[in-house]
């Protein structure tokens, strides 16, 4: 009996186009994933990663799973993005965005250029403008946060922060605006 992992042919196609896959037999790639949407230029997919979704895109220089397994489901991953470990569903990561080990990024999130978080960060329906930095052990949902103009001039949320948007009676949730968004960050 010959054992082959699901998506074995797709893994072979990735390797053939130049993707670095240190341990090919540990990857799980869904049948719906379009290999043409995964760049072969300087992309590394480390052991234990799972890639699902017909809308998944992985651009050049992306690094997936360096610190632990990554599950991606219908995400758009821009150039030089580092998703070091965790679960990522229906989210967008622009150039240089990054998330540490044990991240949980759910639907509706956008991490713009060089925005990112350390380990154990949970996001849902959150937009981080360029250069926003999130510390470790954070739950940061339903937020729009302005970032800054560079890595030196940026916005940061410290570690062990929880942001829930419920009224005291628990009957309603509302989004939060953090930073100087109304005065021109969106322009």
Enumerate the predicted regions with their spans.
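Domain-scale signature associated with acetyltransferase and cell-envelope carbohydrate enzymes
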Residues: 1-185
């Amino acid at each position: 009996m010959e054992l082959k992992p699901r998506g074995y042919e797709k893994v072979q196609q990735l390797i053939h186009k130049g993707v670095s896959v240190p341990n090919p037999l540990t990857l799980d790639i869904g049948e719906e994933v379009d290999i043409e949407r995964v760049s072969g230029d300087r992309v590394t997919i480390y052991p234990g990663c799972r890639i699902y979704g017909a809308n998944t895109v992985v651009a050049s220089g992306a690094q997936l799973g360096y610190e632990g397994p990554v599950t991606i489901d219908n995400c758009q991953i821009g150039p030089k993005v580092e998703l070091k470990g965790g679960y990522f569903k229906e989210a967008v990561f622009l150039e240089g965005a990054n998330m540490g080990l044990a991240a949980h990024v759910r639907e509706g999130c956008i991490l713009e250029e060089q925005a990112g978080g350390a380990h154990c960060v949970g996001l849902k329906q959150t937009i981080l403008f360029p250069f926003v930095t999130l510390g470790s052990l954070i739950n940061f949902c339903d937020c729009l946060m302005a970032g800054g103009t560079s890595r030196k001039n940026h916005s940061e949320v410290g570690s062990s922060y929880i942001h829930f948007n419920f009224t005291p009676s628990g009957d309603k949730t509302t989004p939060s605006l953090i930073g100087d968004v109304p005065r021109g960050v969106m322009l």
